[in-house]
């Protein structure tokens, strides 16, 4: 570095003779540029020019303002618009203002002192010039100080733009002065022994001007104006916070506090004393909250006329350009000081070798090293923190924007993206962009950092650097190609992981059906297949990353070997300073080589995410113009559609419903009827504006309420679901419970209306969910009610009560559109709309439509056919002289209509010739009148939930340190302790080889070996050591990868096996989101992060040990400082980890509710929009986002709090070591050992931080192992197969079932649900099971399938006690059609025959019998036709028929029907019943039904009430006597009669 001795470094003159040095090898232009930037004379000229320009501009603006004020006073207009009495205001200042004032005053004082000093001490020739320079600078700084102080008086929220620009230029000039001063101190010029005034000024001014630079970027003055009404500055970024809130101290922290993370101290103190809980973590600062960011994002969204192609990217840049610029400045500051250490190695080596001009030079070197390391550490962690904070703000902004968009999407757009994909936009793409912020600047910083390194290496090694460039280029290309390969592998890995997660989610959602069908093995194998594909890509991905890591860790030693070989060949002298400066620069270059390719890939992924988000955010929204809505409109029409044609597809002109013309008057009840798939629900959707309007006009008068066919229940309390955001009105609330028949439910539920409803209403019966939905609608008191098949899931009595008390009672006077399959209610509606093939084919009153026949006649005929079964039973009772009647007077109905062949039988008379006795006029029945009224009322009015207690448990959360058992479990799962021992061995051996190479370099470059230096031996030995090092790092990397993969696969199989064989009660009490988080986030941590972190921790600690060994070996007094500082490190770790560990746990806990609420809202968006509750749901989303991000924010703060302190300790150890080296005599410490020690010590701060941080990181990630372990220890249900007790292959061969005193409770210490049930069912019998909602009907089926184990009694089927059988042997022998038809994503074939046991011929035969052959055959893919998630592209009726097809293929001897036809119309019901009667004539059938006709042709009927078998006999015999069943039949008949 010969150029450091140039005279122009200290010459204040601008003579050209100082510029060009003939001896220099640099070109003349480069020497001129160097002179202009680094010589004091041009620097002073530049500084004075900036000062003078600033003063002139300031003077110009002052004159202009003075003239303007004078003119205003002359015209008397200055105060004309001001109020006579101003509002009371108070001005306060934050730490930012105080810091700015202090800095400007200090700069002013220093400038004045230097001005006076220059006048009295400068030599005569330059006294005037020197004094004038400092005078101009002093005047400028004084003016700035006065200006800043006056900002408080004028209550200015932001600094003038002129001042902010000046501070930026002043920082640049001061940086040039500082660099020049450092070079001056390092030069060989004898004048460097004494400090110049310029050097002193620059060293003092540099940190101060850096502070002002940050202030200029922020823009805010820190002055806050508080009025009597509003406590917020007009335009300030400082937001005043309510004192009562537990707001993050970051909001009110001073500049110093933010700089050194002092604002984190109170929270860390709390966490150290006791484990943190949710309430102790402060909320976000107001400027960081989601609601403010959402408003900002919306205001910056490109206007339509801008025609932006990338609106999301454009908006994010507009919102956060200041934050992006600030992090860029921090990155540049870090880059400017990162190479100071390596440059100083040569100076230290020269100093200790005797080339010292004065003792003070050594102290100057230590001081420069200390300042450089401090700036590096501070800028690094401020960059990390602010980048993470920026990422957090972007994620928060995107989540709220995506959520708001999700509430506006059309049905077609929502289906195109899919609920799962929309959730991925929020969970994956937003996170991708957030994570990108840490790597954003690496893309343009990497070329600068490498270029700086090459320049330094060239000045050190000369032409030998060519080999370095070639080697680095080769490594860079290898890493780039490897990273691209990793990206491909990662993409495939994510795709396969998504498939595995989708299959897992599907399994969890429909676990009850899977257990009923004994498909656990099938789904286990299915998920394992997805996992095997995922594991294949995971292995490729991890081994590829291991290859990149090998190259990165080998870079310093590999490039050093190439470079030194070239240097020796070219005859370059290698001394200690040159060698260790080179190796240190190579170590620093590891970072950009590592980060740049990944940054490029991350940028590419971010651009893909932005493209996906652009497509989503630009998706079509529901048009407000689709429906004309008006409040308090004139006229009698409440709902009207004229010439309406509607499509579900925004781009398709093919209508789903067309030629719609109808109107419903205010207060009318209009029923919409039709067969399955006729368009009834679509008609309601068109009224709500949910469909794409192709033509026509839709008009709705007033507010709307909507009750969906498929219940949408929120995860919350019953009360929350009913209130739906409205305040509690107790009298109205109680009345709503009454009319919706929920009073008894509230009484029985353990917590009443505060009972928590599980995910998707899992702890409620179908009827309870439907009634809660209805109660929610009724409580809203809307004008127009759209009810979609609300009676399908409730029994006859409950349905009648709801119709009378609610529909015709509480909602009387409201306009109601009721979709229903219950023909019974149609007598009492004002208008009936009959639909077929997407059109309204008939419209009118009941009498009119019945007389016309056609479609409505067919519906009534189907209903009448089913009623004949009821009346036939009644006729039998009549024939036995047992008259049936009711205390209620019955109406006779006589309808005249022409009889036609095959027309429905609709004529009713009062003649006793008719066998339909239940429809005759009232007559007293002595036996029925003797029936206990209380028992009837209790039976008819009871709605006992089968399990009303709080099912959803709080998530288990460990506190304190992760136990040693968790570490032991992970470490020993694959190969016992030997696995971890090998990891440590390879790490220690590799580090030892690196130390050997460095010791060899020190030995060969020592002064005593200068004469006997043998280049061949030097290179040969170094290359051998380098090769050994590379082999060891290969072994370590690949072994850690293998160990991690094996352990991850073991854990996955354990948790999958545990889940598949978990009892149903586990899934009832555990939300699927909680399970999925284990299968996704926690499994990913075990798959990828933990293995490499363990390897890295071992490496970091062995590296740290090597640094301490080398440092203490040559600067042994340092050990006295290392011991206390080491203890301080350990204390900091424990202090930090206590809070960080809990924050990580809380982050996991608060993240799931954000995802759950997002997906829940998208699933129920029709309901939300119908009630106009979008603002309430957006607010809830914001609340959950803030709750989660506050954990993220404070966790990031704690990370940088720790990192800054640990790296600072490392820097102090380094500087203390360097101080001892310069203090020790040169005959005690050798120059080569100084170089070796410094080359190790320069990385001490980083290694120390990463060693501690990664160990904390592992502990946080070990929480994932802890959480997985919780689910691998789930108590399993009974054995899957019992070899000693296998039933015969043809079992059950008769179908005889005997229950002996069977008792069932769902969980210990809960009431019995079945209370001693004893019944006997003969083979081939058809048993109908009836009872009120929650009476225990479904529990009966569950205990027969052993989804819940009996608490007492026996169940004998064909002579075998089912509790002695394996679960698979039991369940696989039964057939069941569940209440809710479940289809899995896939094809028709995979749904009807999941286990692939049957031929295509058998499948087609089954489809033909269940009336679906024509539907499937009409599709191009036939049996491979697509079935969407949950069968959404198939109607409810078609889904039920497919479920019937499964049972027909299975041909089980015992068949269970669990309200299988509750959601279909009478025609479809009749068809299903006919198929079952014909195809299962010799089978035992147990049918649970709400529809009485379904059980009237059964051999026997079981009446269950409150868990007891109250009646069990044939329908005729039960009707012959005073029975509960008779009362139920009578109730149903009365309802059908329209009473």
Curated annotation (Swiss-Prot):
<feature type="transmembrane region" description="Helical">
    <location>
        <begin position="1238"/>
        <end position="1258"/>
    </location>
</feature>
<feature type="transmembrane region" description="Helical">
    <location>
        <begin position="437"/>
        <end position="457"/>
    </location>
</feature>
<feature type="transmembrane region" description="Helical">
    <location>
        <begin position="1088"/>
        <end position="1108"/>
    </location>
</feature>
<keyword id="KW-0547">Nucleotide-binding</keyword>
<dbReference type="InterPro" id="IPR044746">
    <property type="entry name" value="ABCC_6TM_D1"/>
</dbReference>
<feature type="transmembrane region" description="Helical">
    <location>
        <begin position="461"/>
        <end position="481"/>
    </location>
</feature>
<feature type="transmembrane region" description="Helical">
    <location>
        <begin position="324"/>
        <end position="344"/>
    </location>
</feature>
<dbReference type="GO" id="GO:0005773">
    <property type="term" value="C:vacuole"/>
</dbReference>
<feature type="transmembrane region" description="Helical">
    <location>
        <begin position="363"/>
        <end position="383"/>
    </location>
</feature>
<feature type="transmembrane region" description="Helical">
    <location>
        <begin position="549"/>
        <end position="569"/>
    </location>
</feature>
<keyword id="KW-0812">Transmembrane</keyword>
<feature type="transmembrane region" description="Helical">
    <location>
        <begin position="247"/>
        <end position="267"/>
    </location>
</feature>
<dbReference type="InterPro" id="IPR011527">
    <property type="entry name" value="ABC1_TM_dom"/>
</dbReference>
<keyword id="KW-1133">Transmembrane helix</keyword>
<dbReference type="InterPro" id="IPR003593">
    <property type="entry name" value="AAA+_ATPase"/>
</dbReference>
<feature type="transmembrane region" description="Helical">
    <location>
        <begin position="100"/>
        <end position="120"/>
    </location>
</feature>
<dbReference type="InterPro" id="IPR003439">
    <property type="entry name" value="ABC_transporter-like_ATP-bd"/>
</dbReference>
<dbReference type="Pfam" id="PF00005">
    <property type="entry name" value="ABC_tran"/>
</dbReference>
<feature type="transmembrane region" description="Helical">
    <location>
        <begin position="131"/>
        <end position="151"/>
    </location>
</feature>
<feature type="domain" description="ABC transmembrane type-1 1">
    <location>
        <begin position="324"/>
        <end position="605"/>
    </location>
</feature>
<keyword id="KW-0813">Transport</keyword>
<feature type="transmembrane region" description="Helical">
    <location>
        <begin position="1015"/>
        <end position="1035"/>
    </location>
</feature>
<comment type="function">
    <text>Pump for glutathione S-conjugates.</text>
</comment>
<keyword id="KW-1278">Translocase</keyword>
<dbReference type="GO" id="GO:0005774">
    <property type="term" value="C:vacuolar membrane"/>
</dbReference>
<dbReference type="GO" id="GO:0008559">
    <property type="term" value="F:ABC-type xenobiotic transporter activity"/>
</dbReference>
<feature type="transmembrane region" description="Helical">
    <location>
        <begin position="1209"/>
        <end position="1229"/>
    </location>
</feature>
<comment type="similarity">
    <text>Belongs to the ABC transporter superfamily. ABCC family. Conjugate transporter (TC 3.A.1.208) subfamily.</text>
</comment>
<protein>
    <recommendedName>
        <fullName>ABC transporter C family member 14</fullName>
        <ecNumber>7.6.2.2</ecNumber>
    </recommendedName>
</protein>
<feature type="domain" description="ABC transporter 2">
    <location>
        <begin position="1297"/>
        <end position="1531"/>
    </location>
</feature>
<dbReference type="GO" id="GO:0000325">
    <property type="term" value="C:plant-type vacuole"/>
</dbReference>
<feature type="binding site">
    <location>
        <begin position="674"/>
        <end position="681"/>
    </location>
    <ligand>
        <name>ATP 1</name>
    </ligand>
</feature>
<feature type="transmembrane region" description="Helical">
    <location>
        <begin position="197"/>
        <end position="217"/>
    </location>
</feature>
<dbReference type="InterPro" id="IPR044726">
    <property type="entry name" value="ABCC_6TM_D2"/>
</dbReference>
<feature type="transmembrane region" description="Helical">
    <location>
        <begin position="165"/>
        <end position="185"/>
    </location>
</feature>
<dbReference type="GO" id="GO:0005794">
    <property type="term" value="C:Golgi apparatus"/>
</dbReference>
<dbReference type="InterPro" id="IPR036640">
    <property type="entry name" value="ABC1_TM_sf"/>
</dbReference>
<feature type="modified residue" description="Phosphoserine">
    <location>
        <position position="894"/>
    </location>
</feature>
<dbReference type="InterPro" id="IPR017871">
    <property type="entry name" value="ABC_transporter-like_CS"/>
</dbReference>
<dbReference type="InterPro" id="IPR027417">
    <property type="entry name" value="P-loop_NTPase"/>
</dbReference>
<feature type="domain" description="ABC transporter 1">
    <location>
        <begin position="639"/>
        <end position="862"/>
    </location>
</feature>
<feature type="domain" description="ABC transmembrane type-1 2">
    <location>
        <begin position="980"/>
        <end position="1260"/>
    </location>
</feature>
């Amino acid at each position: 570095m010969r150029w450091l001795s140039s005279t122009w470094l200290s010459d204040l003159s601008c003579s050209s003779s100082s510029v060009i040095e003939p001896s220099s090898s640099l070109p003349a232009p480069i020497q001129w540029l160097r002179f202009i930037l680094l010589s004091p004379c041009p620097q002073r000229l530049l500084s004075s020019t900036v000062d003078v320009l600033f003063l002139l501009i300031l003077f110009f603006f002052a004159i202009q303002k003075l003239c303007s004020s004078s003119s205003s006073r002359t015209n008397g207009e200055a105060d004309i618009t001001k109020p006579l009495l101003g509002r009371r205001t108070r001005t306060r200042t934050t730490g930012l203002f105080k810091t700015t004032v202090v800095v400007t005053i200090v700069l002013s004082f220093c400038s004045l002192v230097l001005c006076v000093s220059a006048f009295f001490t400068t030599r005569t020739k330059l006294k005037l010039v020197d004094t004038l320079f400092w005078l101009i600078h002093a005047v400028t700084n004084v003016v700035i100080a006065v200006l800043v102080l006056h900002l408080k008086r004028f209550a200015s929220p932001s600094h003038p733009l002129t001042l902010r620009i000046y501070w930026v230029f002043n920082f640049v000039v001061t940086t040039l002065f500082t660099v020049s001063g450092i070079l001056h101190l390092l030069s060989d010029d004898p004048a460097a022994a004494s400090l110049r005034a310029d050097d002193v000024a620059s060293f003092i001014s540099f940190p101060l001007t850096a502070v002002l630079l940050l202030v200029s970027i922020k823009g805010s003055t820190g002055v806050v104006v508080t009025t009597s009404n509003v406590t917020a500055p007009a335009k300030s970024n400082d937001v005043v916070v309510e004192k009562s809130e537990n707001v993050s101290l970051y909001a009110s922290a001073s500049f110093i506090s933010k700089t050194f993370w002092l604002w984190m101290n109170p929270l860390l103190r709390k966490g150290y004393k006791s484990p943190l809980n949710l309430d102790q973590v402060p909320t976000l600062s107001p400027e960081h909250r989601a609601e403010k960011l959402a408003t900002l994002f919306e205001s910056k969204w490109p206007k339509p006329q801008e025609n932006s192609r990338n609106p999301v990217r454009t908006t994010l840049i507009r919102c956060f350009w200041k934050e992006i610029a600030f992090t860029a400045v921090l990155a540049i500051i870090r880059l400017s000081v990162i190479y100071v250490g390596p440059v100083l190695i040569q100076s230290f080596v020269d100093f200790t070798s005797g080339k010292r001009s004065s003792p003070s030079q050594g102290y100057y070197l230590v001081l420069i090293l200390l300042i450089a390391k401090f700036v590096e550490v501070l800028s690094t962690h401020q960059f990390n923190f602010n980048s993470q904070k920026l990422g957090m703000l972007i994620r928060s902004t995107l989540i709220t924007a995506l959520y708001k968009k999700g509430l506006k999407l059309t049905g077609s757009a929502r289906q195109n993206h899919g609920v799962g994909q929309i959730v991925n936009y929020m969970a994956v793409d937003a996170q991708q962009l957030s994570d990108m912020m840490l790597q954003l600047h690496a893309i343009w910083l990497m070329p600068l950092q490498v270029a700086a390194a090459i320049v330094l290496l060239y000045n050190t090694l000369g032409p030998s650097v060519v080999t370095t460039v070639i080697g680095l280029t080769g490594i860079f290309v290898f890493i780039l190609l490897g990273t691209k390969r990793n990206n491909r592998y990662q993409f495939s890995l994510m795709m396969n992981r998504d498939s595995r997660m989708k299959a897992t989610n599907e399994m969890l959602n429909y676990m009850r059906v899977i257990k009923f069908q004994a498909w656990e093995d099938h789904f286990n194998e299915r998920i394992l297949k997805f996992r095997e594909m995922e594991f294949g890509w995971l292995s490729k991905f991890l081994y590829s990353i291991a290859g990149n890591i090998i190259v990165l860790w080998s870079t310093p030693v590999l490039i050093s070997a190439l470079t030194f070989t070239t240097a020796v060949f070219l005859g370059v002298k290698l001394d200690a300073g040159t060698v260790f400066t080179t190796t240190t620069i190579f170590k620093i270059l590891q970072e950009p080589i590592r980060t740049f390719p990944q940054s490029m890939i991350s940028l590419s992924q971010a651009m893909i995410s932005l493209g996906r988000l652009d497509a989503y955010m630009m998706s079509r929204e529901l048009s407000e113009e689709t429906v004309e809505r008006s409040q308090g409109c004139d006229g009698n029409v409440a709902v009207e559609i004229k010439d309406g044609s509607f499509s579900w597809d925004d781009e398709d002109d093919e209508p789903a419903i067309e030629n719609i013309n109808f109107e419903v008057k205010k207060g009318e009840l209009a029923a919409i009827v039709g067969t399955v798939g006729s368009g009834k629900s679509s008609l309601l959707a068109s009224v709500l504006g949910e469909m794409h309007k192709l033509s026509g006009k839709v008009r709705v008068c007033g507010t709307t309420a909507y009750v969906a066919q498929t219940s949408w229940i929120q995860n919350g309390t019953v009360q929350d679901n009913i209130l739906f955001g409205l305040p509690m009105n107790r009298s109205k609330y109680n009345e709503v419970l009454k009319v919706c028949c929920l009073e008894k439910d509230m009484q029985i539920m353990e917590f009443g209306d505060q009972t928590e409803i599980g995910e998707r209403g899992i702890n409620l019966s179908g009827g309870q969910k439907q009634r809660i939905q209805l109660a929610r609608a009724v409580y809203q008191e809307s004008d127009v009610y759209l009810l979609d098949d609300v009676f399908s899931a409730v029994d006859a009595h409950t349905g009648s009560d709801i119709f009378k008390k609610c529909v015709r009672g509480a909602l009387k006077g409201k306009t109601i559109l009721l979709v229903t399959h219950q023909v019974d209610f149609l007598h009492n509606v004002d208008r009936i709309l009959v639909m077929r093939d997407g059109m309204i084919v008939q419209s009118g009153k009941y009498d009119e439509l019945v007389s016309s026949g056609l479609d409505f006649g067919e519906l009534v005929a189907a209903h009448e056919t089913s009623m004949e079964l009821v009346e036939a039973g009644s006729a039998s009772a009549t024939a036995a002289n047992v008259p049936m009647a009711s205390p209620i007077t019955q109406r006779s109905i006589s309808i005249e209509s022409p009889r036609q062949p095959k027309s429905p039988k609709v004529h009713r008379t009062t003649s006793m010739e008719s066998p339909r006795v239940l429809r005759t006029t009232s007559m007293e029945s002595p036996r029925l009148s003797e029936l206990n009224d209380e028992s009837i009322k209790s039976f008819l009015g009871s709605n006992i939930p089968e399990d009303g207690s709080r099912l959803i448990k709080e998530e288990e959360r460990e506190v304190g340190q992760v136990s040693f058992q968790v570490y032991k479990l992970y470490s020993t799962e694959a190969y016992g302790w030997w696995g971890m021992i090998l990891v440590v061995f390879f790490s220690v051996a590799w580090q030892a080889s690196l130390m050997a190479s460095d010791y060899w370099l020190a030995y060969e470059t020592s002064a005593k070996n200068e004469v006997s230096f043998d280049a061949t031996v030097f290179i040969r030995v170094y290359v051998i050591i380098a090769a050994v090092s590379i082999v060891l790092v290969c072994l370590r990397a690949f072994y850690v990868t293998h160990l991690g993969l094996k352990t991850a696969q073991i854990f996955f199989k354990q948790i999958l096996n545990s889940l598949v064989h978990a009892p149903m009660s586990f899934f009832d009490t555990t939300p699927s989101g909680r399970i999925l988080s284990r299968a996704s986030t926690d499994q990913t941590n075990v798959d990828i992060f933990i293995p490499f972190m363990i390897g890295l921790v071992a490496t970091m600690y062995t590296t740290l040990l090597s640094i301490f060994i080398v440092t203490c070996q040559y600067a042994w007094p340092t050990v006295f400082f290392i011991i206390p500082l080491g203890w301080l490190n350990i204390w900091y770790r424990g202090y930090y980890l206590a809070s960080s560990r809990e924050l990580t746990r809380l982050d996991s806990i608060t993240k799931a509710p954000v995802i759950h609420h997002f997906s829940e809202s998208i699933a129920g968006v029709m309901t939300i929009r119908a009630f106009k509750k979008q603002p309430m749901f957006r607010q809830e989303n914001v609340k959950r986002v803030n709750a989660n991000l506050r954990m993220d924010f404070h966790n990031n703060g704690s990370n940088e709090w720790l990192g800054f302190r640990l790296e600072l300790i490392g820097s102090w150890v380094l500087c203390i070591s360097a101080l001892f080296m310069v203090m020790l005599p040169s005959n005690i410490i050798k120059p080569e050992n100084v170089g070796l020690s410094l080359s190790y010590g320069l990385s001490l701060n980083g290694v120390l931080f990463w060693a501690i941080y990664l160990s904390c990181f592992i502990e946080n990630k070990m929480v994932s192992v802890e959480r997985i372990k919780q689910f691998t220890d789930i108590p399993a249900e009974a054995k899957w197969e019992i070899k000693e007790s296998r039933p015969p292959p043809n079992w059950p061969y008769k179908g005889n079932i005997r229950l002996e005193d069977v008792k069932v409770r769902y969980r210990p210490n809960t009431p019995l649900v079945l209370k001693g049930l004893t019944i006997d069912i003969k083979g081939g019998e058809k048993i109908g099971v009836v009872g009120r909602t929650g009476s225990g009907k479904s529990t009966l089926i569950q205990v027969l399938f052993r989804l819940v184990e009996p608490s007492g009694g026996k169940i004998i089927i064909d002579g075998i006690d089912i509790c002695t059988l394996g679960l698979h042997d039991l369940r696989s022998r039964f057939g069941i059609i569940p209440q809710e038809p479940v289809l899995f994503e896939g094809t028709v074939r995979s749904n009807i025959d999941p286990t692939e046991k049957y031929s295509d011929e058998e499948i087609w035969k089954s489809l033909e019998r269940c009336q679906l052959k024509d539907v499937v055959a009409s599709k191009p893919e036939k049996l491979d036709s697509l079935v969407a998630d949950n069968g959404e592209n198939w109607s409810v009726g078609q889904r039920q028929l497919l479920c019937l097809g499964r049972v027909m293929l299975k041909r089980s001897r015992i068949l269970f029907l669990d309200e299988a036809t509750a959601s279909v119309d009478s025609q479809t019901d009749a068809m299903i019943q006919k198929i079952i009667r014909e195809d299962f004539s010799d089978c035992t059938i147990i049918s649970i039904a709400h529809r009485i006709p379904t059980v009237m042709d059964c051999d026997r009927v079981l009446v269950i009430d409150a868990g007891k078998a109250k009646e069990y006999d044939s329908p005729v015999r039960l009707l012959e006597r005073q029975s509960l069943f008779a009362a139920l039949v009578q109730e149903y008949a009365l309802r059908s009669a329209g009473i």
